Amino acid sequence: MNSNVENLPPHIIRRVYKEVSTLTSDPPEGIKIIPNEEDITDVQVNIEGPEGTPYAGGMFRMKLILGKDFPAAPPKGYFLTKIFHPNVSNNGEICVNVLKKDWKAELGIRHVLLTIKCLLIHPNPESALNEEAGRLLLENYEEYASRARLMTDIHAQGTSLRGKDPTDPCSSASTPVVSGDGPMAKKHAGDRDKKLAAKKKTDKKRALRRL
């Protein structure tokens, strides 16, 4: 892989190195940086699939490539782990506004990573690179979620990450993971109700035995 380090001015290299070092020691919730000491323009990370989404329980490897025009031009983002998502093409390319028209030179790598993680919670079918995933998201959410879970189970099994980031715009403290009336929400609510009912039944039997 060709490195862009020699194409970047020294002050940009120092900026990137500092931010990657900070992200490595203090990563956002559900994100782990994998430093590349030989090429800091190749930023690879593991992103934990957010709870309440079809990607929950998965660990997704992705990378940002910082081009020679960075930070005037946005980095390019790719998922290395196969994923069924409207905004990720078959070759892993990520389509999100912050990597295109909404990019600003002052935006950092942390902001980009949090935006990509947020995309797992709130897909945007209007800018779909995977047309089938975008169509299913709009027309048949249950089928979309089933396909996404299957891909997650096959390709994205990994170890859970720990730690919370108060700056994460998609954290449970600031943004609900799914709407209360969505198919996933109903499923989880039903599972919880069944478990509570079973527990109450068991507790009642134990109480009767003591009488």
From Swiss-Prot:
GO molecular function terms attached to this record: ATP binding; ubiquitin conjugating enzyme activity
Top-level taxon in the UniProt lineage: Eukaryota
Pathway: Protein modification; protein ubiquitination
Active site: C95
Comp. bias regions, Basic residues: 197-211
Single GO BP term: positive regulation of ubiquitin protein ligase activity
Gene3D superfamilies (alphabetical): Ubiquitin Conjugating Enzyme
A Gene Ontology term for the protein's cellular component: anaphase-promoting complex
Top EC category: transferase
EC id: 2.3.2.23
Annotated spans, Disordered: 158-211
Residues of the UBC core domain: 11-157
Coiled-coil ranges per UniProt: none
Keywords per UniProt: ATP-binding, Cell cycle, Cell division, Nucleotide-binding, Transferase, Ubl conjugation pathway
Reactions performed catalytically: S-ubiquitinyl-[E1 ubiquitin-activating enzyme]-L-cysteine + [E2 ubiquitin-conjugating enzyme]-L-cysteine = [E1 ubiquitin-activating enzyme]-L-cysteine + S-ubiquitinyl-[E2 ubiquitin-conjugating enzyme]-L-cysteine
Described function: Catalyzes the covalent attachment of ubiquitin to other proteins. Acts as an essential factor of the anaphase promoting complex/cyclosome (APC/C), a cell cycle-regulated ubiquitin ligase that controls progression through mitosis. Acts by specifically elongating 'Lys-11'-linked polyubiquitin chains initiated by the E2 enzyme ube2c/ubch10 on APC/C substrates, enhancing the degradation of APC/C substrates by the proteasome and promoting mitotic exit.
Similarity comment text for this entry: Belongs to the ubiquitin-conjugating enzyme family.
PANTHER family given in the database record: UBIQUITIN-CONJUGATING ENZYME E2 (PTHR24067)
Name used for this protein in its record: Ubiquitin-conjugating enzyme E2 S-B
Gene, per the UniProt record: ube2s-b
